[in-house]
C-alpha cells in the first residue's frame, strides 16, 4: 500500500499526475506479481475530513439556494443583464443538483469525493514511463565507485541500477551523479 498527495489528472485513458507517478511502482509491481485486483482510492478533497466535507457541501447547497432565489428576484426586476451575469456564474444544472440533495445524498456524495475507487488494470508501459524500476541490485555494486562487485572493471550508473526516486528531479540527479562517479572511477581519476 502506498499513498501520496498532489494534483491529479483525469485523462481519457486513466489517471495521471505526480501522485500517480509516485505510487505507480507499487501498483505495477502488484500487477506484475499477479496479486489480483489492484485499486487506487482517490480523495478529491484531502484538506477536508468527511464530516467537514458534508458541512461544506451543505454550505454550498445553501449558498446556491440563496443565489437561485436572488437570480429569480432580479429577473423579475428591471435588471435582466445583471440576472444573466449572476446566472452564468453558477451552472444551473449544478445548482439544481445541490439544491435537491437530501441529507443522505449529501453524505453519499461526500463519501464518493473522499473514497473514489479506480481499478488499475495496467500501466502505459515503458514508452510512457517517467522512471523505471528494477535493474542491477545495489548490493552487487560498490556504491563509492559504482563498480560491479561481480565483474571487475564494469561500472554502472543511472537507471541501469535498481534505484528510483520520487518526482522532482531526483532521478535525473541520480543519473548525473552516478554517471560522474562511474566515469571518473573507470578512468582512474
Q: Positions of the model-derived regions?
A:
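N-terminal low-complexity, intrinsically disordered patches enriched in charged
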Residues: 23-26, 143-144, 178, 188
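A conserved FAD-binding loop/helix module that cradles the flavin
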Residues: 163-189
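A glycine-rich dinucleotide-binding beta-alpha-beta segment and adjacent secondary-structure elements
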Residues: 88-164
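Predominant activation on well-ordered alpha-helical scaffold segments within soluble catalytic domains
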Residues: 20, 110, 114, 176-184
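An anion/pyrophosphate-binding glycine-rich loop and adjacent beta-alpha core
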Residues: 1-106
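Short, surface-exposed, polar/charged, turn-prone segments marking secondary-structure boundaries
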Residues: 37-39, 68-72, 140, 149, ...
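Gly/Ser/Thr-rich beta-alpha loop segments that engage phosphate groups in nucleotides
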Residues: 16-19, 136-137, 160, 167-171
Amino acid at each position: 500500500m502506498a499513498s501520496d498527495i498532489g494534483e491529479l489528472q483525469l485523462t481519457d485513458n486513466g489517471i495521471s499526475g505526480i501522485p500517480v507517478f509516485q505510487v505507480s511502482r507499487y501498483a505495477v509491481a502488484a500487477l506484475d506479481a499477479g496479486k489480483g485486483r489492484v485499486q487506487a482510492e482517490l480523495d478529491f478533497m484531502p484538506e477536508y475530513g468527511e464530516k467537514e466535507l458534508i458541512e461544506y457541501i451543505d454550505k454550498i447547497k445553501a449558498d446556491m439556494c440563496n443565489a437561485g432565489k436572488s437570480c429569480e428576484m432580479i429577473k423579475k426586476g428591471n435588471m435582466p443583464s445583471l440576472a444573466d451575469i449572476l446566472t452564468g456564474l453558477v451552472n444551473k444544472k449544478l445548482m439544481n443538483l445541490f439544491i435537491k440533495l437530501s441529507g443522505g445524498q449529501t453524505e453519499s456524495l461526500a463519501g464518493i469525493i473522499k473514497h473514489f475507487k479506480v481499478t488499475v488494470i495496467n500501466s502505459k508501459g515503458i514508452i510512457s514511463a517517467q522512471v523505471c524500476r528494477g535493474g542491477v541490485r545495489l548490493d552487487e555494486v560498490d556504491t563509492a565507485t559504482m563498480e560491479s562487485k561481480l565483474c571487475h572493471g564494469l561500472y554502472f550508473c543511472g537507471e541501469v541500477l535498481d534505484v528510483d526516486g520520487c518526482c522532482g528531479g531526483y532521478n535525473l540527479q541520480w543519473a548525473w551523479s552516478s554517471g560522474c562517479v562511474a566515469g571518473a572511477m573507470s578512468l582512474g581519476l
